Amino acid sequence: MKALWALLLVPLLTGCLAEGELEVTDQLPGQSDQPWEQALNRFWDYLRWVQTLSDQVQEELQSSQVTQELTVLMEDTMTEVKAYKKELEEQLGPVAEETRARLAKEVQAAQARLGADMEDLRNRLGQYRNEVNTMLGQSTEELRSRLSTHLRKMRKRLMRDADDLQKRLAVYKAGAQEGAERGVSAIRERLGPLVEQGRQRTANLGAGAAQPLRDRAQALSDRIRGRLEEVGNQARDRLEEVREQMEEVRSKMEEQTQQIRLQAEIFQARIKGWFEPLVEDMQRQWANLMEKIQASVATNSIASTTVPLENQ
């Protein structure tokens, strides 16, 4: 039984470990007609419309219309996910209790991450509405630019976690179909060759050493798998935080540069206003002085010419 579930889980775990290297696409792979996927598609369509930041979007963002619509779509999606998970639990065949609990825990964690992503998106749009309403007619271009950047990042995170949830539900569904269609006898028949191979290996290795070795290998594999998932999630979260911090620093630097430029222009205008009257006054005084000097020189020249004439 464990070997069967190990075969089912290997592709899922491989995909999870590769998430950090693959670019998140715009659509979920392998979509079906499940109600929860249809509800999620409606959420995607609405989010794509919000990301256009058209005039209508801007108008509705300034009210509570967008957040109300998102709330309804979020609740519909999570309700359908819970219903589908419950349906699979009821169909799940006679698998080991440990396997059942582990799968349920993984699906629950993926479901919680997707719900948290949706909640973060709604809160960010509410924050944007508050910021726009406080601008009171001022330019909101910078706010729209930052919102557009945040929406792209949030959409990537949503797609990543939605894809993860879909993969884990697929594994859950595989177990349910196996139990519903074939039952215990079919599973035993399928596992017969594996059991026989295990017995042969046990005979070769020794009855006392084979089972503890397999148990230790299984435990080590579980620990490594869990640790790799934990490290991968932490690394992705940290990278996202660093990117957001760098974006905020860049925005602040641009804002400060603009402020410094404006202050320099204002100071230059003030300096010009201070010195222009002084320069004009000095020019007038200099012109008056030159006129007086020229008049004095002319008077002296006339006087010098008149005196010799009188002496004659």
UniProtKB/Swiss-Prot annotation:
Q: Which domain of life is it from?
A: Eukaryota
Q: Which UniProt keywords apply?
A: Chylomicron, Endosome, Extracellular matrix, Glycoprotein, HDL, Heparin-binding, Lipid transport, Lipid-binding, Oxidation, Phosphoprotein, Repeat, Secreted, Signal, Transport, VLDL
Signal peptide limits:
1-18
An individual GO BP term? regulation of protein-containing complex assembly
Report the family membership. Belongs to the apolipoprotein A1/A4/E family.
In this UniProt entry, the residues modified to Phosphoserine are S139
In residue numbers, the region (8 X 22 AA approximate tandem repeats) covers 72-247
Look up the further comments and give them: The mature protein has no cysteine residues; however, in different allelic variants where cysteine residues replace arginine at positions 155 or 168, binding of Apo-E to cell membrane receptors is decreased. The amino end of this protein is therefore thought to interact with the receptor.
Query: Where is the segment annotated LDL and other lipoprotein receptors binding?
Result: 150-160
Give the protein's biological function.
APOE is an apolipoprotein, a protein associating with lipid particles, that mainly functions in lipoprotein-mediated lipid transport between organs via the plasma and interstitial fluids. APOE is a core component of plasma lipoproteins and is involved in their production, conversion and clearance. Apolipoproteins are amphipathic molecules that interact both with lipids of the lipoprotein particle core and the aqueous environment of the plasma.
Posttranslational modification, per the record? APOE exists as multiple glycosylated and sialylated glycoforms within cells and in plasma. The extent of glycosylation and sialylation are tissue and context specific.
Write down the Pfam families for this protein, in alphabetical order: Apolipoprotein
Please tell me where this protein is predominantly located.
secreted
Localization (cell): Secreted; Secreted, Extracellular space; Secreted, Extracellular space, Extracellular matrix; Extracellular vesicle
Task: Detail which positions bind heparin.
Answer: M154, R155, K156, R157, S221, D222, R223, I224, R225, G226, R227, L228
Q: Where is this region: Lipid-binding and lipoprotein association?
A: 202-282
Gene3D superfamilies (alphabetical): Apolipoprotein (1.20.120.20)
The record's section on InterPro entries has: ApoA_E, Apolipoprotein_A1/A4/E
Q: Which GO terms of the molecular function aspect are on file?
A: amyloid-beta binding; antioxidant activity; cholesterol transfer activity; enzyme binding; heparan sulfate proteoglycan binding; heparin binding; hydroxyapatite binding; identical protein binding
In residue terms, where are the sequence repeats?
Answer: 72-93, 94-115, 116-137, 138-159, 160-181, 182-203, 204-225, 226-247
Modification Methionine sulfoxide occurs at: M135
> What protein name is recorded for this chain?
Apolipoprotein E
**Positions of transmembrane segments:** none
